[in-house]
Amino acid sequence: MSSKSLFLLSFIVFFLYSLYSSAEFLKKELLISNSDNQLKYFIVEVADNDKLRSLGFMGRTDIPEGTGMLFIWNDEAYRNFWMKNTPSSLDIIFFDKNGYFINVQENTIPFSLDNIQSLKPSKYVLELIAGSSKKFNLYNHSRIINLN
């Protein structure tokens, strides 16, 4: 590896580390009523500003089951995601302003640049480790109940 390439790689690693070290995700408990009206609890990191939303799960390889990231906006709009710099396969679940399920993209492809979009305007987006939607039955009629 040339010294130029090594320098560039070092810079990228340092840059990503500095982003993560300065990012402070607040952890909260999320309560969802699933498709069978059963209550499911998740510990989520809240991404409620541009900086945190831009980081998401980028670079993370260890996402324990029952944990996730909840993206929150002040308004409803069509939301777009991609998996660039995200090494873990995820389920990405979109909810409307009232917390009702819109759609889910299951088992996303790590590092993919494919567009993952809500089918309707969304205010909340939940990212969980791949397979969680199926395991916890998070489909039609699922609803966010509470975030503490």
Where are these regions (language model features)?
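Bacterial N-terminal signal peptides that target proteins for export
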Residues: 1-8
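Low-complexity, intrinsically disordered regions enriched in charged/polar residues
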Residues: 9-10, 51
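Cleavable N-terminal signal peptides
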Residues: 10-11, 20-21
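N-terminal signal peptide c-region/cleavage motif recognized by signal peptidases
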Residues: 16-18
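Compact, glycine-rich, soluble single-domain proteins
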Residues: 22-148
